[in-house]
Swiss-Prot record:
Protein's gene: PETE
Name of the molecule in the record: Plastocyanin
Cellular compartments annotated: Plastid, Chloroplast thylakoid membrane
Cellular component per GO, a single term: chloroplast thylakoid membrane
Record family assignment: Belongs to the plastocyanin family.
Pfam families: Copper-bind
GO molecular function annotation: copper ion binding; electron transporter, transferring electrons from cytochrome b6/f complex of photosystem II activity
Alphabetical keyword list: Chloroplast, Copper, Electron transport, Membrane, Metal-binding, Plastid, Thylakoid, Transport
Signal sequence, renumbered to the chain: none
Recorded topology in the membrane: Peripheral membrane protein
Length: 97
């Protein structure tokens, strides 16, 4: 699955913001617009036992085209956000099946 950080029209969103992947399928988060973004999984909004520090990308992806890939191995729903833009609504959710 590929997720854009920033919509094609410049909106501060994950695109798509809600999606599903199979357990073990990689998710590539790619900076689309060149604004600094990161991907932080909410420790209260992931399946029990998941260590969010191991799946989050807290360092900023500053440039267009920079990417971060993560593979989730526990089934369930994970919520994530971009720290600098969470207040603008840059949040997302992935369901692992």
């Amino acid at each position: 699955a590929e997720v854009k950080l920033g919509a094609d029209d410049g909106a501060l969103v994950f695109s798509p913001s809600s999606f599903s992947v199979a357990k073990g399928e990689g998710i590539s988060f790619k900076n689309n617009a060149g604004f600094p973004h990161n991907i932080v999984f909410d420790e209260d909004e992931v399946p029990a036992g998941v260590d969010v520090s191991k799946i989050s990308q807290e360092d900023y992806l500053d440039g267009a085209g920079e990417s971060f890939t993560v593979t989730l191995t526990e089934k369930g729903t994970y919520k994530f956000y971009c720290e600098p833009h969470a207040g603008a609504g840059m949040k997302g959710e992935v369901t692992v099946t």
